[in-house]
Regions:
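Structural recognition of alpha->loop->beta junctions
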Residues: 45, 109-114, 201-216, 287-301
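Short amphipathic alpha-helices and their capping/turn segments at secondary-structure boundaries
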Residues: 71-75, 126-140, 171, 200-210, ...
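Acidic (Asp/Glu)-rich catalytic clusters
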Residues: 75-77, 104-112, 132-142, 174-178
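Conserved C-terminal portion of the radical SAM core fold
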Residues: 167-227, 244-267
Length: 308
């Protein structure tokens, strides 16, 4: 008899939809961001350096189909029969003219072995005409729209120059879910000014939204960002968790989350040459093992402290 899982894991979620192994391939489709080009603001979010999540095969000068083929070769040596999700990750992947967006998504879906899309975007970049198109696309392929939520506190969103309020996130998530589209969120735990109590309250706020999946990761200070300069000038404004502190925070956070939300990850690993701090020297699976060990010690599980 198998043990009850401590939390809902993303691989188990994918098994509900696919009878084979599935791997996401990150893409850089040449998008920018309304928080960089002046539409919403300039300079971007203070923590952001998109180099931190662009693999070597993922370059804007390469066509989407070529990025996917190179990504497939990167993964195929391990699982030759694997299928793939095209992950539009870098910048804001719904920011553009509708016909241009459709061409990009459909170019990805035309690649052999690609069985669906994951589209990362901002909650203030989901116009009605695009949402109608995605609603129809969702009838023919796997589709997950992943919103960068980052925080539920408007004070924090202003501080990191996010360019939208939490209510904008609420509206986007609810509109997307109402179209029958799987809807995910991404948050950063430990943004400046946020306490342990604030962060746990965030879990409660997110649990009220119709989210299917959630990614979280620790605040990382990245070279070349405005936040790195802020840290250099005022380090007292930041609390950078040590690994044990962050494990305990994640456990508390997960206990307050709605039990059915699928948890995709707890940490992120930025390239060594870009990372200022914290540097724990752990792989994702090593951190996950620490979380699972701590949850077992505390008899914790996802949703244990969840209140509707």
């Amino acid at each position: 008899m198998s043990a009850t899982p401590l939390y809902n894991e993303f691989p188990s979620f994918l098994k509900r939809y696919f009878p084979y192994k599935v791997q996401k391939i990150s893409l850089n489709a040449g998008f920018t961001c309304p928080n960089r080009d002046g539409s919403k603001g300039y300079g971007g979010c203070t923590y952001c350096n998109n180099q931190t999540f662009n693999p070597d095969y993922c370059r804007t000068e390469k066509p989407i189909a070529l990025q996917l083929e190179e990504g497939k070769r990167f993964f195929a040596h391990k699982y030759p029969e694997m299928k793939y999700l095209a992950y539009f990750q870098a910048y804001t992947n719904t920011y553009g003219e509708l016909e241009s967006l459709k061409r990009k998504y459909e170019e990805a879906l035309a690649v052999d072995g690609v069985v669906g899309l994951v589209i990362g975007t901002r909650p203030d970049c989901m116009p009605d005409d695009l949402l109608r198109y995605l609603e129809n696309l969702n009838k023919h392929t796997f589709l997950l729209v992943e919103y960068g939520i980052e925080s539920t506190r408007d004070e924090t969103l202003r501080r990191i120059n996010r360019g939208h309020t939490f209510q904008v996130t609420v509206n986007a998530v609810e509109r997307t879910d109402a179209c029958g589209i799987l809807t995910g969120g991404h948050v950063i735990l430990g943004l400046p000014g946020e306490t342990h109590r604030n962060i746990v309250a965030q879990a409660k706020d997110l649990s009220r939204l119709p989210l299917t999946t959630l990614k979280m990761h620790q605040l990382q200070l990245i070279r070349g960002t405005r936040m790195a300069l802020e840290y250099e000038r005022n380090p007292e404004d930041f609390h950078l968790f040590n690994v044990d502190e962050y494990v305990d925070l994640v456990v508390d956070y997960v206990e307050h989350l709605r039990p059915d939300i699928v948890l995709e990850r707890f940490v992120s690993q930025s390239p060594k040459e870009l990372l200022i701090a914290p540097d724990w020297g752990l792989k994702n699976y090593e951190f996950n093992h620490r979380v699972q060990k701590r949850m077992k010690e505390l008899d914790a599980y996802q949703g244990k402290k969840y209140e509707m």
